[in-house]
């Protein structure tokens, strides 16, 4: 899909970046959920969905603990899956905790203990109607190194859920699933997952697909060669019936891949962002065809950044600084949606003081206001 623009924003952004840092002039930062002593995190793992001005986001709610490294969550205390919903385009939010979405009992999710009361894992028969606009799925993992993984599904915009359903390993040493999928048709879905490498460690991106409404899920392809380090946490956009662009988290940068045969094979386009401290991307397509990527910036000054591509991911702008007031590197995992009015809602976990709780925040902003 090609779009002719009279004055490409990308060119303007590059020229502007030579003179000053890029920021949206109208960005509004909001607290979505914050509670003293708690760790709220990782929207990128759980997913975001929208229906007009109705937006639904998932996240993990555990307990804060000031660890020596990594995430500041107490791995010895149970965590739970939580949703937050906005009916006004991200201005206000309410917390939801459907019973069917809770993690399986007495195990781990993303290495964090689960409680005793969640529904047990089971094999699910499939038969899902992907053409239902209210149908959504979320994918979760036990260990970030080697899985295993499961999924939940909802047919009513996340008000009620069924699961957890065993996902399988697709012949891989392990599957560490987060939520990234594309609906291709009423019974056809492509899912982008992280698999363990041959040494049993994270990870590399694989593509799986169902053509029979989830009754069977089949391995389709690897996205790139097995890395020496890791290549994980994809975020995908369909450009056409055959073309898909996917952004992938690397150790300290973001890779962008493209497939022109609907996911059968992939080519590396570029590194969209470098030296960011390690954080997953969230990529969406604007109404005019531009690609917009957001991610957490885990170096000083800590914050949330964005970049834009005018040419389907071939090149990217300089960083757009959504905020720079982070208290430490334990932040990010963004997910972004485009509202009907064209404004963007970027949701992420955040901190303004590294020694205090992690909270869920949102930035509402307009790409057209970037200067």
Regions found by a protein language model. Give the residues of each.
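Positively charged n-region of N-terminal signal peptides that target proteins for export
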Residues: 1-4
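Bacterial N-terminal signal peptides
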Residues: 6-15
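Asp-box/BNR beta-propeller blade signature and adjacent active/binding-site loops
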Residues: 20-371
